[in-house]
């Protein structure tokens, strides 16, 4: 039955192909000098400083709070552009709850790893979001919006936490709308929220550095 249906479908396609004398092929694109550059404040480093193990819970997840870092995108001319994030330390995510705006979250694609102990234990994870879902667009306040890559730009929604798997494109819109706007400069006030495992699980005996790293990539719209 499947072969018959397939043959029928192919026959219909062939018949359709010869129903007209011509077909139109279009090749489209856009050449532009409006290249954009992303830049993070503080050299791209979010520093939680020295964390004393003796001040942490041995058995419960330790919420270490929020830190701010700005992402500024500058373009040579007004440009519609967004960005995605990929976690370079994905294998070190601990899968523990993170305090996201007062709500505990542990959805994997919203979490980023921060490295492992010498013993191979995943230290913890953090979340990344945009403060108050607001963006400064050419000096004016606007809104954070996002669109998943498999939506192919067909829809945009109000923003939230930033996915760590490169699936969601983050961009900027005029306040109260969800349509990307062209800009020359946009500032996205990023916030990290960090949690690490209890010290009994970490079993750290020597100084251990947090080693979170993520890559931000621009996407022209």
Regions found by a protein language model. Name each.
Residues 1-20:
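Gram-negative bacterial Sec-dependent N-terminal signal peptides
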Residues 19-221:
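Mature extracellular/passenger domains of Gram-negative fimbrial/pilin and adhesin proteins
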């Amino acid at each position: 039955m499947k072969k018959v249906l397939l043959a029928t479908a192919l026959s219909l396609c062939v018949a359709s192909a010869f129903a007209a004398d011509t077909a139109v092929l279009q090749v489209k694109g856009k050449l532009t000098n409006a290249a954009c550059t992303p830049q993070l404040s503080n050299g791209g480093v979010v520093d939680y400083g020295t964390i004393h193990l003796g001040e942490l819970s041995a058995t419960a997840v330790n919420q270490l709070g929020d830190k701010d870092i700005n992402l500024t995108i500058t373009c040579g001319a007004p440009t519609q552009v967004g960005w995605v994030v990929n976690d370079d330390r994905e294998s070190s995510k601990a899968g523990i709850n993170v305090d996201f705006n007062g709500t505990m979250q542990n959805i994997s694609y919203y979490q980023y790893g921060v490295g492992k102990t010498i013993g191979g234990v995943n230290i913890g994870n953090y979340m990344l979001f945009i403060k108050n879902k607001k963006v400064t667009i050419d000096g004016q306040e606007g809104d954070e919006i996002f669109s998943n890559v498999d939506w192919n730009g067909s829809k945009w929604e109000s923003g939230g936490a930033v996915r760590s798997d490169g699936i969601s494109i983050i961009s900027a819109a005029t306040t109260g709308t969800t349509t990307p706007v062209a800009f020359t400069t946009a500032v996205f006030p990023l916030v990290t929220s960090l949690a690490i495992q209890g010290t009994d699980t970490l079993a750290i005996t020597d100084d251990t550095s947090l080693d979170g790293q993520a890559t931000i990539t621009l996407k022209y719209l």
